[in-house]
């Protein structure tokens, strides 16, 4: 399948998908920073722009749809999908924002969810029999997270936490089964990621054992 997504090292910001001035975006960002300083619940830039009547709800939905498709297309697992397929699969994903030092995947817990890291930084880790943490890897955008639980009935095989404020896309495994099992390029890429992550985990655990 032809990939029509323009490859960039970093995903594009939402403002690049909206037909509004940079000044309007700066005002929205200022309001977001003010809310943070006051300890109030922070809204997304798009929501603030709608409240300011700079854009319409429909404009925001369309921009998010296009941004989501681009971000998913930058993920190694889904980069072979066409533009139409990326927009389609994007309907199953939603945006998640997390603060720094926030553990959101817990080893041994049932969480049938695939995440895509689109901004920020994550740490993957496990624990030995004594409860000591074993660092496995740091993960940077754009990479899938939580994929190894797919073949474990949703049980996570490692823990993951944010290192800095992080943006993710998330979707339930059940929404992605068709792509993982019936789209060859996606299935191959998905298995490649799993094999690489398994090798990293085994290597880190061996290194930790050798240090004792």
Predicted regions and their residues:
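A small-molecule sensor/coupling module
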Residues: 68-69, 82-88, 156, 174-212
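A short beta-strand-loop-beta hairpin characteristic of the jelly-roll/cupin
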Residues: 122-134
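Residues that scaffold the ATP/ADP-binding catalytic core of kinase and kinase-like folds
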Residues: 58, 89, 125, 147-148, ...
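Non-catalytic accessory regions
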Residues: 1-87, 211
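Cyclic-nucleotide recognition modules
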Residues: 134-191
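A short, compositionally biased micro-patch
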Residues: 109, 117, 129, 153, ...
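Short hydrophobic beta-strand motif reused across regulatory alpha/beta modules
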Residues: 49, 54-55, 117, 122, ...
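Regulatory nucleotide-sensing modules
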Residues: 73-125, 144
